[in-house]
């Protein structure tokens, strides 16, 4: 049986990830998610390179492009990317077979995205990276160490 997200009764089951700044109605966003060829990929190491993402996600089909997430101030990788495929079917294969696998010793997560728009490659946290990293309390060397608030206090070694 092939998974077809266009037949779901509950649109929230389509994607746990939602762009909070989506310009449009919830219904528009749900329609875009049901027909999109774009995946949001999170929990990447800050050291993961674009060619690594192409190589892994290319196993599922023809990748149109990869857009690496960047710290909006430093313009350095900040742990996420968007992967665009030419077809929905290839994106579905990637979602089914690559999400929750390891890349650079990290379990990555992929989910549907409504479609990349210029500017979304930049982190939205107040320090320029991802918001989720600003709430992280543990030390994570693959994602910049401590979050910046803890780092400014000298680290939380508990």
Swiss-Prot record:
Source organism superkingdom: Eukaryota
UniProt binding sites for mRNA: 17, 40, 109-113, 120-124, 130-131
GO cellular component, one term: nuclear periphery
Region Disordered: start-end pairs: 123-158
Phenotype upon loss of function: Lethality in 98.7% of embryos.
Basic and acidic residues bias: start-end ranges: 130-145
Subcellular location: Nucleus
CDD domains tied to this protein: RRM_NCBP2 (cd12240)
Keyword tags: mRNA processing, mRNA splicing, Nucleus, RNA-binding, RNA-mediated gene silencing
GO molecular function: RNA cap binding
Gene3D superfamilies per record: 3.30.70.330
Example of a GO biological process term: mRNA export from nucleus
Entry similarity comment: Belongs to the RRM NCBP2 family.
Entry function: Component of the cap-binding complex (CBC), which binds co-transcriptionally to the 5' cap of pre-mRNAs and is involved in various processes such as pre-mRNA splicing and RNA-mediated gene silencing (RNAi). The CBC complex is involved in miRNA-mediated RNA interference and is required for primary microRNAs (miRNAs) processing. In the CBC complex, ncbp-2 recognizes and binds capped RNAs (m7GpppG-capped RNA) but requires ncbp-1 to stabilize the movement of its N-terminal loop and lock the CBC into a high affinity cap-binding state with the cap structure.
Subunit relationships: Component of the nuclear cap-binding complex (CBC), a heterodimer composed of ncbp-1 and ncbp-2 that interacts with m7GpppG-capped RNA.
Name of this protein: Nuclear cap-binding protein subunit 2
Encoding gene, per UniProt annotation: ncbp-2
